[in-house]
Amino acid sequence: MEWKYVIPGIPDNFFERDEEIPMTKEEIRALALSKLRIRKGDMILDIGCGTGSVTVEASLLVGSTGKVYGVDKEEKAINLTRRNAEKFGVLNNIVLIKGEAPEILFTINEKFDRIFIGGGSEKIKEIISASWEIIKKGGRVVIDAILLETVNNAISAMENIGFINLEITEVIIAKGMKTKVGTAMMTRNPIFIISGEKQ
């Protein structure tokens, strides 16, 4: 499938899905990718790649001169990300690794320009610490979180490690749903997008 636009936000229904595998929804994904500030040729790491929606869109943004690494502890997620990458024709500049963060991150022999941390890992502090070791100077880290505890732990860890220009954005999305008498707005769970830079 070809995504012919130069902006992120591929509709969710364009991706192959699995009910057991989480997906970063299109509006949140578009905001998270904008916070990453991806450039052509960047090296990107997607920790907790899930369905591969962020991996695929990041790959489209970095182009053929960049590379995106997708990491997930679930084999089903790795396989689903692979299928979605094939569907969008970007598998050639994606590397998929099965393993659990933060441990698996130290086996990757690369430094990254941008790191996206999706989902709600209990090891968020350790993952942020590992990210500091493998991100280039001037690199950006963006985290999506649902739980307030994850937000608190992430901000605390980022401040203590030395990330600068920290931002937190709370996003509440409501989508229209047709009913018998009109359109009702259905609110999704609030998502927090946390970002920071390594100086």
Curated annotation (Swiss-Prot):
| Protein name, as recorded | Probable cobalt-precorrin-6B C(15)-methyltransferase (decarboxylating)
Keywords in alphabetical order: Cobalamin biosynthesis, Methyltransferase, S-adenosyl-L-methionine, Transferase
- What is the species listed in this Swiss-Prot or TrEMBL entry? Saccharolobus islandicus (strain Y.N.15.51 / Yellowstone #2)
Q: In which pathway does it act?
A: Cofactor biosynthesis; adenosylcobalamin biosynthesis; cob(II)yrinate a,c-diamide from sirohydrochlorin (anaerobic route): step 8/10
Any idea which GO molecular function terms this record carries?
cobalt-precorrin-6B C5-methyltransferase activity; protein methyltransferase activity
* Bilayer-crossing regions: none
Q: Which GO terms describe its biological process?
A: anaerobic cobalamin biosynthetic process; methylation
Gene name on record?
A: cbiT
InterPro entries, alphabetized: CbiT, Cbl_synth_MTase_CbiT, Cobalamin_biosynth_MTase, Methyltranfer_dom, SAM-dependent_MTases_sf
